[in-house]
């Protein structure tokens, strides 16, 4: 039973990481006028193929490269900021509860893994993207 509870806590941490990542994209789609409600995102229970949902594709296609790049990086930026906040919280709040510690450590690790995965394995190339930002 303890193992099942740990799996559920880890799943919840992963779900929350993906939800926050998608909210990062969604917020900037909304800010650039491609979405009516930035809170509405789709994160499926099986976690794959999550999207910022309900994006006006016609408006999104007309975005400048710089705006499109900001939207692309918004998800990993949220992951990095949230991981940093969780590290600070973990530093100041120490718990004797093994489940709270598991959640916090999983949450920090998964946020960092999510960001690193997109930076290293994904189709994001920092050098070429920085050129777009500087234009």
Feature-to-residue mapping (PLM):
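Small-residue-rich helix-interface/hinge motifs
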Residues: 9-64
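Long, highly hydrophobic alpha-helical transmembrane signal-anchor segments
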Residues: 1-18, 79-95
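Metalloprotease/metallohydrolase-associated module, dominated by Zn2+-dependent proteases
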Residues: 55-135
């Amino acid at each position: 039973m303890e193992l099942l509870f740990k799996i559920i806590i880890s799943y919840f941490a992963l779900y929350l990481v993906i939800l926050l990542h998608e909210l990062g994209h969604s917020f900037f789609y909304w800010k650039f006028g491609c979405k009516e409600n930035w809170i509405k995102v789709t994160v499926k229970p099986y976690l794959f193929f999550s999207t910022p949902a309900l994006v006006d594709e016609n408006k999104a296609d007309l975005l400048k490269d710089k705006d499109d790049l900001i939207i692309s990086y918004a998800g990993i930026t949220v992951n990095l900021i949230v991981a940093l906040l969780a590290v600070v919280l973990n530093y100041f709040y120490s718990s004797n509860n093994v489940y709270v510690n598991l959640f916090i450590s999983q949450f920090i690790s998964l946020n960092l893994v999510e960001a690193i995965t997109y930076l290293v394995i994904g189709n994001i190339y920092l050098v070429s993207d920085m050129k777009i930002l500087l234009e």
